[in-house]
Amino acid sequence: MTKPALRSDIPMKPTVHKQEKPSVAFAHLGCEKNRVDTEHMLGLLTEAGYSVSSDENDAAVVVVNTCSFIQDAREESVRTLIGLAEQGKELIIAGCLAQHFQEELLESIPEAKAIVGTGDYQHIVDVLKRVEAGERVNHVSEFPTFVGDETLPRQRTTDQAVAYLKVAEGCDYRCAFCIIPKLRGDQRSRPVESIVTEAHQLAEQGVQELILISQITTNYGLDLYGKPKFAELLQALGEVDIPWVRVHYAYPTGLTPEVLAAYREVPNVLRYLDLPLQHSHPEVLRAMNRPWQTDVNERLLDRIREQLPDAVLRTTLIVGFPGETEDHFNHLAAFIERQRFDHVGVFTFSPEDGTAAADLPDRVDPSIAAARKDRLMALQQPISAERNQRWVGRTIDVLIEQHNPETGAMIGRCDRFAPEVDGEVLVLPSEKGLQASPGTMVPVFITGSDVYDLTGQLVDTNAMAVTAQTSQ
């Protein structure tokens, strides 16, 4: 891994002291956990009376919430920072890149007026006030311990009907390839009551889909209660008036019989399992420092299908890990072909300084790793197409997210598709010309499918919020 290539030729400008509070904009990069942090900073600044613009061009200060998970993410973050600096914007750099390279950023980008760590974003108002006073601020805790909760102001950036809820922060696992524990600290779970309170708040805002996130969501509560309490959390969220509760990052070790029973018994918990398995071969898993998984994968998947026969299964995989041979890869390909996941994401290995994998021998040539990724995705595509085709001829609920008033066409998602990472449903007006507004959940008859998406037609019913198609 190389450190981000930062520019050092931007001339330092004197800080201008103003009577009025500066206008602020946000640039959000990275994962949905980072998004929640951005939303809290937005809420805090708005509550403090700052003018927050959705357009970076209209703002004097831009808060850039960065990602540093892999090299590509770092490069995107640096490109964003340099582009804004060249526009003359004053920058507050937050997030994982700030946690990772705080000194380098301050030294190389004069426009960087403040650095805010992953465990320090709750201080964004104080940081901005210090910047206004002419101070250059480095507010980064070496060991992040903070986790936001329902008492922290929040201004959501997602569609009105979708919200992410962070149940814990940080990670206690030490996978050889992952830098996250060094950037976000050890696991800190929120109390069940705190999470449920925020879920009720989101329900009152009209949220239809609640997505639970953390680094290891199924290990929720282990640090706080001495044992995982994820099953109890799901049961408690069953009392919240939100139709869909989706779980991301369901690690295999946490999918106990009690948790699977909660998936089965709690009506609003979607039977959608996002399983970051990473690989199938025992030798690669040991090198990844995930040896416990060797005997788990097959047995776990069998148990899921036995208890949740209609479950939607997604997994993410890494190819090109140091020492991965062609035999190892073929083992993984056979595993994918045998298990027939609904959705698969494949990443090539990215060496990260500070991780055990960065020093491993037998690096796989990047061109070989890229070819393996392509081969695995080509193998998965007909499987995904087959899994989608099963829904043709059925009527399913679809959450509408976009609507074209000129054509009447709508785009939404059914419960088998998570936002951003999975497919969509193209919805045509009903036979009577009815259309649905974004944010509504409606019945759709599925008429077609492909590798990633479904196509359907709105079903005529008096039980849904619709608008009549305007005659041209």
Curated annotation (Swiss-Prot):
Documented EC number(s): 2.8.4.4
A cellular-component GO term for this protein: cytosol
Catalytic activity of the protein: L-aspartate(89)-[ribosomal protein uS12]-hydrogen + (sulfur carrier)-SH + AH2 + 2 S-adenosyl-L-methionine = 3-methylsulfanyl-L-aspartate(89)-[ribosomal protein uS12]-hydrogen + (sulfur carrier)-H + 5'-deoxyadenosine + L-methionine + A + S-adenosyl-L-homocysteine + 2 H(+)
Bound cofactor: record note: Binds 2 [4Fe-4S] clusters. One cluster is coordinated with 3 cysteines and an exchangeable S-adenosyl-L-methionine.
Bilayer-crossing regions: none
First-level EC class: transferase
MTTase N-terminal domain residues: 22-133
SUPFAM superfamilies, per the entry: Radical SAM enzymes
Pfam family, one: UPF0004
SMART domains listed in its UniProt record: Elp3 (SM00729)
Gene Ontology molecular function, alphabetical: 4 iron, 4 sulfur cluster binding; aspartic acid methylthiotransferase activity; metal ion binding; protein methylthiotransferase activity
Domain TRAM, chain residue ranges per copy: 389-460
Example GO biological process: tRNA modification
Role: Catalyzes the methylthiolation of an aspartic acid residue of ribosomal protein uS12.
Protein name: Ribosomal protein uS12 methylthiotransferase RimO
Organism annotation: Prochlorococcus marinus (strain MIT 9313)
